[in-house]
Amino acid sequence: MTGPQPPVYGTARGPLARLASPLAARARQRRHAQFFALTGVAQGAKVLDVGCGQLGLRALEPEMDVTGVDVLPQPGYPGPFVLADPAEGLPFADGEFDLVYCNSVIEHIPPARRQAFAAELRRVGRGWYVQTPAWSFPVEPHALLPGAQWLPARWRKHYWKLGAAGGWEDISLLRKGELEELFGGPVFGERMGRLVKSWISVRRSTHREATVREGVDVVGEADHEEH
């Protein structure tokens, strides 16, 4: 059962965002099915949603035991919520959660703070699911502009304004090897056609379903050789 769905593109603007949103919504549903297959997490597991925003994982699984964490207040969040910056420390015990869920968040963390951010997620979770858009994918997903992430900063700041309402300075997409360094393997590739659209680092939850859900196409960690 799913709840109300948040906007797919919170930063991109213009007609391309409207055209891309239905495709992205379907991709999000497929990714969510993969979430269960990859992690083996049970409905009764205790989950921490890092960078939850207004709904986060609760939009897709409103009945799960989910605690939200965000650096910004989320007064309408439908469940337990903690205002905290993981890179500065989280108010939870070691291994307090069966799984830490972090979807399209780590690319917003400054590179110098990512080691501390990742270490805290690994500390509080017995398992984790960390997804981030792939640097190698030809369309930057926050601005929906081709190749925006590959441009030098002096050009990117002008190009970015064509597609995004927010600033570009706080977004730095990751390569597969960077995610591996932060969380270790395995790292899986989420594909769009023949291209890897995002990288997903997984450590399987210790609180698992008895059987993995059927009918889910899980892509392998060796699907792409980018490092």
What are these regions, as identified by a protein language model?
Residues M1-G40:
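Class I SAM-dependent methyltransferase Rossmann-like catalytic core
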Residues A17-S21, Y159-E169:
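Short glycine/proline- and acidic residue-enriched helix-loop micro-motifs
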Residues R28-Q29, P110-P111, S172:
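A conditional alpha-helix N-cap/helix-loop micro-motif detector
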Residues F36-F137, R203:
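Conserved SAM-binding loop
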Residues G127-R154:
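Conserved class I S-adenosyl-L-methionine
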Residues A165-G185:
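Short alpha-helix
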Residues G185-L195:
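Conserved S-adenosyl-L-methionine
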Residues L195-H227:
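C-terminal lobe and adjacent flexible extensions of AdoMet/dcAdoMet transferase-like proteins
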